[in-house]
């Protein structure tokens, strides 16, 4: 059974918190689908080329049909002309969004947390509050964890706490309502407040 590591105020291991057994039964394909959907939603569909009907001009036949010794042509917007339309070029009317349902999102998050717990990279603390708002205090916590890139998850971060974590390059502070499977998978380790952890564990499968 995979377990999260409970840390005390000195960031030393004090206990272990078991994850529900059903987490082990979740297929990794749910995580794959969510990450694919998340990244596709970030894709900027900006590549575009004008077709021959979208290029300006071309209303007049460039030269007469016969007698010129040149190939016949009906419009300068033809793809064979410089400045003409593009055949089979990229279009910005394509929608890359991939939708998944609420249950799959939930399963993906549970799968990501389970994987972090298996790796021994899921930590639980009582609070992440940084009343001082100083980066050095947040860095001291990060350094004490002896981890690499770390996702911190708070129930609801206040402004001082947000400011304390903002400038740390290998860290990211997320609120509970911002937490998703992609964020969990993107960082090497996850530090989550116990209140948030308890809420996640208490929720039923797929809800």
UniProtKB/Swiss-Prot annotation:
InterPro entries per record: Ribosomal_uL4 (IPR002136), Ribosomal_uL4-like (IPR013005), Ribosomal_uL4_dom_sf (IPR023574)
Pfam families: Ribosomal_L4 (PF00573)
Function: One of the primary rRNA binding proteins, this protein initially binds near the 5'-end of the 23S rRNA. It is important during the early stages of 50S assembly. It makes multiple contacts with different domains of the 23S rRNA in the assembled 50S subunit and ribosome.
GO molecular function: rRNA binding; structural constituent of ribosome
Region annotation (Disordered) ranges: 49-73
High-level lineage: Bacteria, Pseudomonadati, Campylobacterota, Epsilonproteobacteria, Campylobacterales
Subunit structure: Part of the 50S ribosomal subunit.
Alphabetical GO biological process terms: translation
PANTHER family attached to this UniProt entry: 50S RIBOSOMAL PROTEIN L4, LARGE RIBOSOMAL SUBUNIT PROTEIN UL4M
Gene name as annotated: rplD
Keyword vocabulary terms for this entry: Ribonucleoprotein, Ribosomal protein, RNA-binding, rRNA-binding
Family membership: Belongs to the universal ribosomal protein uL4 family.
Organism field: Helicobacter hepaticus (strain ATCC 51449 / 3B1)
Signal peptide bounds: none
GO cellular component: ribonucleoprotein complex; ribosome
Protein name (database record): Large ribosomal subunit protein uL4
């Amino acid at each position: 059974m995979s377990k999260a590591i409970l840390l005390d105020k000195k960031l030393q291991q004090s206990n272990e918190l078991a994850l529900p057994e059903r987490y082990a039964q979740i297929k990794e394909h749910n995580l794959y689908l969510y990450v694919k959907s998340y990244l596709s939603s970030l894709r900027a569909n900006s590549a575009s080329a004008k077709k021959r009907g979208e290029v300006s001009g071309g209303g007049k036949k460039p030269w007469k049909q016969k007698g010129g010794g040149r190939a016949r042509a009906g419009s300068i917007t033809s793809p064979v002309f410089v400045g003409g339309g593009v055949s089979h070029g990229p279009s910005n009317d394509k929608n890359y969004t991939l939708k998944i349902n609420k249950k799959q999102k939930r399963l993906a998050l549970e799968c990501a947390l389970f994987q972090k717990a298996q790796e021994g990279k899921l930590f639980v603390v009582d609070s992440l509050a940084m009343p001082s708002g100083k980066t050095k205090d947040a860095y001291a916590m990060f350094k004490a964890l002896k981890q690499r890139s770390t996702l911190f998850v708070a129930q609801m971060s206040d402004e001082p706490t947000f400011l304390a974590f903002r400038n740390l390059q290998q860290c990211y502070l997320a609120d509970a309502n911002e937490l998703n499977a992609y964020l969990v998978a993107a960082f090497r380790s996850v530090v989550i407040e116990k209140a948030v952890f308890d809420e996640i564990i208490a929720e039923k499968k797929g809800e």
